[in-house]
Structures are given as structure tokens and as C-alpha cells.
Amino acid sequence: MDRKGFLDSPSTKILQDLAVAPVDLTTPGIISQERVERFSLSIGGFTLSYATERVDEGVVSALTDLASERGLVSSMQAMQSGEVVNYIDNFPSESRPALHTATRAWVKEIPLTGNAEDIALRSKIEAQRLKDFLHQYRDAFTTIVQIGIGGSELGPKALHRALKGCCPSDKKVYFVSNIDPDNAAEVLQEIDCSKTLVVTVSKSGTTLETAVNEEFIADHFLKQGLHFRDHFIAVTCEGSPMDDRSKYLEVFHIWDSIGGRYSSTSMVGGVVLGFAYGFDVFFQLLEGAAAMDLAALAPQMSENLPMLAAMLGIWNRNFLGYPTSVIVPYSAGLEYFPAHLQQCGMESNGKSIAQTGEIIGFATSPILWGEVGTNSQHSFFQCLHQGSDVIPIEFIGFLDNQRGRDIVISGSTSSQKLFANMVAQSIALAKGRENTNPNKSFRGNRPSSLLVAERLTPYTMGALLAFYEHKIVFQGFCWGINSFDQEGVTLGKDLANQVLGIMQGQAKEGACLEAEALLKLFNSTQKKKS
């Protein structure tokens, strides 16, 4: 990566000039067959169309140069080969590799060395251990409950939901993440504990929410006359407080170099997916992810799908100045995927410190959010079409449905109607429509992209997961920030312990005056009502 900085790159000035008058998507006939073909890329079963982005050949050329100047390919090579990429210069930091790609490299026997080879070999061993465990115990349980928060819940939950429509399963799966006791209590009301396997996921083995929820659920099992070790397994780092086979039925390992939000292809996602759908389905997901890992190493942006998507996002964020971006999958199976991408993107790139340790002077991660289509058309699309802010949209769609069941009504299937709506929204946002009634007028020039595959399968889902991981990481490399730590989550947790001490009467008076004032207000006003 070029250490000069994002703003000092020669292509940054060129792109700033080009952004003064970007392509006008409302120009009649501009979204032509020629433009659609020119501004598209098909790789690994996916086609990305960006003809409805506010780009022309000059912009794409400058983005290509910027990617080269910022050393995106070499940085991706460094990450996948196990070099230390999680660091901040001259300050204490985690200072370690980011090796989520190694958790699936073994399925394609990708040649690796050093740290990457070590994690790939360990991942293969853990996968075989999981396969053996499932062979021995999968039929003994009808239900699995995964306890974990952040990356230990969002990614696995999104993947489990995504595969539900294409992979038969007679297993029930639940996730408990929130420290709110109602979360765990609701799950406990719905399960037969005697037939339930609980997997507790925590890298450190000390995550507060996870530890509390495990104890909450274990207490209920004990009251049912069930033994902890017969029903609880763990996924954690070697040597953590949870790495105890005398306590758990089984313990599976992850490693410090696997970030939580990037851990779904490790045992963090493998156990629950293997239990729900079988080991072979998890293996197919790994194959898709590994294929996209290789695609992310392509040296030219014109052949590198996640890099192209990343640089289009850079154009929208840093040069057109759009502060937020919405992800809209036209697939019921991707119901929870936007929430996973929200964490992956904003926790990775929601930074204002460069890896040089300096405060940066430009925008980084946009606010990410989303919902499936067509549901979202009936909620927030009003704002996308006519709101005061321009919000770029990333559409995700599939030509065929997962379950193979459909019906023809008024000459078209439901799948065709779904796909037609996605394409129509992209065109409508770009072109707009004039009307003498200003309330019915659409100004257009609302950029979007469409990422399309044939069908959502385990392989496709793995590739889609890795596509977004690499898109996010490429943007971090371009900005020169550390996409692999999350110091921003620590301050609130530290203060929560102080507040809890005040609530328990264990803190010295004046330890946190702000908390004391707020607690006094809420206790006095709410107790009056009760």
C-alpha cells in the first residue's frame, strides 16, 4: 500500500475533478445496450452491472489507477499470505495477520506458507473433527442453540437463513445474542432441552453477553435435570477459559488471526451449519468462498469483481459525497444478510485513524443498512426515490428461486415478477421521471449496481460472503486504515461496568457523575409510575 496517503494519490485529484460533473443518468438513451455491456463484469457465476452508476470510462480509468497507486492487489496478496495487516504504526495494536481466507483455502488445496499455511492446516483438522462429531452426535439432537454476539451470531445466522430454501433439514436452529434475558427466555420456551445441543461461541472465552447467556441457559438445563457436559459444546481460541474438554462435550478452535466478523467460514459458522444441513453443505459453502478468494487476487480491476465493487463504493463515498449506502437483496433467503454486512463494513472501516497513526481528513465507511426486496419497496424506497439525500443502492438478485416451486399468474412467475421489480427499480432510480406535478416528479440520478447470479446455493452463498468481505477490505486498503480491529467497541463496555457498579451500590460516590444523574432521573420518574 502506498504510504503517501489517500488524498496524496495522483488519481485522487483527477477523480475530484471528474466528480464536479458526473455522468447524467437522466439523459435520454444513455443506458443503452452498449453502456450495459461495457459497464459490467462477469466472474465466477456472478455478473455485476454498474451501468446505472454515475460513471463513465474516464471515471473507471481513474479508479483503476487509484487502485494501482494504493497497492490494492499487493495488499490483498499480503493479507492472504499471512503477513501482518492488523496494525497501527508506532502505537500498541493487535499486530497480527488477518487469515479468514485460510479457513477455507484447504478445500481447494491453495498453496500457502508461514502463518497462512498453519491456519489452513489447523482449519482442515478442525473441519475433520467437526465431520466426525456430526457423524457421532447429529442424530442425537433435534435442535441447536448458538450463543454468541457480533460476528458469532450475525454471519452464521445470515448463512443459516440463506441456505434454508435450498438445503433440506429436520433440525431447529436458534440464536441467543442479546444480554436481555427475554432473548434467552423466549428460546427456552420453544425448545425441548433434552434434545437440544448448545454451542457457545467466544474467541476470548470471556465475552460478557455470551458468558451470561450461557449461564442463564445452563441453569435452565440443570433445573430440567440435564447435565451441562451432555448438551454444551464450545467454539473458542486455544487456551481460553472456555477451552476445557472436561467441561464441554466438545471444544472446537478458532484463532486470534480470525476476526469475529470474518469468522463465518471457521467453526464459528461451521458447527451450526453442519448440524443444520450436514457437513457437505458447509464444505460447498467453503468452496464458493475459496473461489472468490482467488478471484480477489486478479491483478487487474477489470477482472477483479470485489475490487471493482470496492472502487465504485469509493467513488460514491469520497468523490460524490454520499454518506450512506443501502443493500437490497431480492431474495427472501438473504433476509439477515444486510445486518451481517452492516457489522462487517462499519466495524471494519468505521475508522478515522490511518494505519500510520495519524487522524485522516476524508470520509471512510458509509452508513450501511438494508432490507430484502420487494418488501423494502413498501417501506423506505419512497426516500430512495424522492428523499433529499441521494443514497446509492446495491441490488442483489437471482434468476431462479431456491425451492423450485412457483406459479404463473398473469403470464409470469413470481420469480420473474421479483426480478423484474429489481431491474425496474434500478432503472427508475437512474432515469427518474418528469411531471408537471412536483409531488409526482422523480429527479433521477440515483446510482445503483446490480449483482446477479443464477440461484442462491451453498456455493453461491460462500462466494457472495467472500465477495463482500473482500470489497470491504479493499476499501480499507485504499483508505489506508486498519479494517481488522474494533477499538470503538471498548469505551462503552468499560463505562457499562462503572454504571453497573453504581446500580449495585459498589462504586464510590462520584465515580461517574453523569451515570449517577441519569440513573437518579430514571429511578425517580419510573418508580413514581409503578
Swiss-Prot record:
It catalyses: alpha-D-glucose 6-phosphate = beta-D-fructose 6-phosphate. InterPro entries: G6P_Isomerase (IPR001672), G6P_Isomerase_C (IPR023096), Phosphoglucose_isomerase_CS (IPR018189), SIS_dom_sf (IPR046348), SIS_PGI_1 (IPR035476), SIS_PGI_2 (IPR035482). The active site is at 347 (proton donor), 378, 493. Pathway: Carbohydrate biosynthesis; gluconeogenesis; Carbohydrate degradation; glycolysis; D-glyceraldehyde 3-phosphate and glycerone phosphate from D-glucose: step 2/4. It holds the Pfam family PGI. Keywords: Cytoplasm, Gluconeogenesis, Glycolysis, Isomerase. SUPFAM superfamilies: SIS domain. GO terms for biological process: gluconeogenesis; glucose 6-phosphate metabolic process; glycolytic process. It comes from the Bacteria. Its main location: cytoplasm. One of its GO terms (molecular function) is carbohydrate derivative binding. GO terms for cellular component: cytosol. Belongs to the GPI family. PANTHER family: GLUCOSE-6-PHOSPHATE ISOMERASE. This is Glucose-6-phosphate isomerase. It comes from Chlamydia abortus (strain DSM 27085 / S26/3). The gene is pgi.
